[in-house]
Amino acid sequence: MKLPKEGDFITIQSYKHDGSLHRTWRDTMVLKTTENALIGVNDHTLVTESDGRRWVTREPAIVYFHKKYWFNIIAMIRDNGVSYYCNLASPYMMDTEALKYIDYDLDVKVFADGEKRLLDVDEYGIHKKEMQYSADMDFILKENVKILVDWINHEKGPFSKAYITIWYKRYLELKNR
């Protein structure tokens, strides 16, 4: 499959472990693709929930997906600074329809002031039982929480101010073509 290129628009589909569609983002602009990663941006992007509800993202957000890490990162660019929403999720795969991944409930939120919170621990516990996450899966996800927190603490990749500046600037250049 041919990788999307800079300026292309793609759909992103989030699934649950049982295979059910969880959420869809329409028209994410691709900023960069490599063999293992995709960087994009959502800006007033239509989101459709599994129950059919629809909403539109409020602010520009740089999105980061990787084929080797069990998380993806959304950097929301707001007036008071950048805040992050990080999904513990399978590495992504891409087909002709969309970029796809499995959402594993746990999320890490990083506020603009640097405060970090692990979210949806109860939901993870419920789904772990209902959808029968294996012990290996549980271990992988918990290890990836540690990796993610390390990235946050060391301002690695998407958590670097320079990264956000570079990719947001590139988005504005592409948007205004």
Swiss-Prot record:
Instruction: Kindly indicate whether the keyword Metal-binding belongs to this entry.
Output: yes
Position of the signal peptide: none
| Molecular function, one GO term | magnesium ion binding
Per its record, the protein catalyses: a ribonucleoside 5'-triphosphate + H2O = a ribonucleoside 5'-diphosphate + phosphate + H(+); a ribonucleoside 5'-diphosphate + H2O = a ribonucleoside 5'-phosphate + phosphate + H(+)
| Keywords from the named record | Hydrolase, Magnesium, Metal-binding
What does this protein need as cofactor?
A: Mg(2+)
Q: What EC number(s) would the UniProt record show? A: 3.6.1.15, 3.6.1.6
Positions of the catalytic residues: 23
Per its UniProt record, what InterPro entries does this chain match? DUF402 (IPR007295), FomD-like_sf (IPR035930), Ntdp-like (IPR050212), SA1684 (IPR016882)
Q: Which residues bind Mg(2+) 2?
A: 105, 107, 120, 123
Where on this chain does Mg(2+) 1 bind? 87, 103, 107
Annotated disulfide bonds = none
User: Known SUPFAM superfamilies for this protein?
Assistant: FomD-like
Query: Taxonomically, which superkingdom?
Result: Bacteria
The broad enzyme category this protein falls into is hydrolase
Q: Which family does it belong to?
A: Belongs to the Ntdp family.
Query: What is the annotated role of this protein in its UniProt record?
Result: Has nucleoside phosphatase activity towards nucleoside triphosphates and nucleoside diphosphates.
The name this protein carries in UniProt is Nucleoside triphosphate/diphosphate phosphatase
Q: What is the lineage of its organism?
A: Bacteria, Bacillati, Bacillota, Bacilli, Lactobacillales
